[in-house]
Amino acid sequence: MSKPIVMERGVKYRDADKMALIPVKNVITERDALLRKPEWMKIKLPADSTRIQGIKAAMRKNGLHSVCEEASCPNLAECFNHGTATFMILGAICTRRCPFCDVAHGRPVAPDAEEPQKLAQTIADMALRYVVITSVDRDDLRDGGAQHFADCITAIRAKSPEIKIETLVPDFRGRMDRALEILNATPPDVFNHNLENVPRIYRQVRPGADYNWSLKLLERFKEAHPEIPTKSGLMVGLGETNAEIIEVMRDLRRHGVTMLTLGQYLQPSRHHLPVQRYVSPEEFDEMKAEALAMGFTHAACGPFVRSSYHADLQAKGMEVK
């Protein structure tokens, strides 16, 4: 029997070390290993990387993190080259260990009390008009990190009064009442929380999370702020069916969610959950049509769509795919 990993505070555990800590083991079959990316999944890198390096330098200067880098997002080059990034607060170590995600797992250090001001200054220096703030899960904090979100929102608005802020929040497991009390006092312009996938395979995809809890979080925020758009997204290609995706979309509408994102799951490493299928652009178009027919005010559905992909355009109701 192998010895359990003793996690040191502040150390990032990735790939095999991270997956070894997950109770539900995922076996990669020969078919999974041979599944190749179709033509529509090939990415063109920009010829000039000057702006990409500039954003990375600004992040490093202030000790900030982007989910684009930490989660190995396939759109990093495109977004950075257009001068946009999704900031990840509360450190770069997550207390969860979801097998689809490339963010490191471990025992995080205490939140940086200066991060809200550093973040606000960086955003002001970049002259951003729309910003997405997300975080790792912080199950070690009594409020799940909600107060830190609120502090960041307050600091950003103080330096950039005209900016629009979207928050992509964790589920605040076991701390919903306290978290919503804080966030209701300092609400963002868009409230986003991702369901990620369908209930049937939740235990494999999101160990430690609960489908109905996440729906309730979205619903309760919407009840408190009916004027603020609520948003959620799924990764597809993890073993779900299109019919199951449609049913999740119905659940989201029943809980007041008005904006939707659907994108193709990509395996960060051979240690993560394998891709079970590649969903075609035509299928994404069909699901978008279904979403709009259900009453979503905006639906971004396509192979490379991620929750914060061109989030400013999504908020304006413009086409994103």
From Swiss-Prot:
GO terms for molecular function: 4 iron, 4 sulfur cluster binding; lipoate synthase activity; metal ion binding. Its EC number is 2.8.1.8. [4Fe-4S] cluster 1 binds at C68, C73, C79, S308. GO terms for cellular component: cytoplasm. Residues 80-297 form the Radical SAM core domain. Keywords: 4Fe-4S, Cytoplasm, Iron, Iron-sulfur, Metal-binding, S-adenosyl-L-methionine, Transferase. It is found in: Cytoplasm. It catalyses: [[Fe-S] cluster scaffold protein carrying a second [4Fe-4S](2+) cluster] + N(6)-octanoyl-L-lysyl-[protein] + 2 oxidized [2Fe-2S]-[ferredoxin] + 2 S-adenosyl-L-methionine + 4 H(+) = [[Fe-S] cluster scaffold protein] + N(6)-[(R)-dihydrolipoyl]-L-lysyl-[protein] + 4 Fe(3+) + 2 hydrogen sulfide + 2 5'-deoxyadenosine + 2 L-methionine + 2 reduced [2Fe-2S]-[ferredoxin]. Pathway: Protein modification; protein lipoylation via endogenous pathway; protein N(6)-(lipoyl)lysine from octanoyl-[acyl-carrier-protein]: step 2/2. Belongs to the radical SAM superfamily. Lipoyl synthase family. HAMAP family: Lipoyl_synth. This is Lipoyl synthase. It comes from Salmonella arizonae (strain ATCC BAA-731 / CDC346-86 / RSK2980).
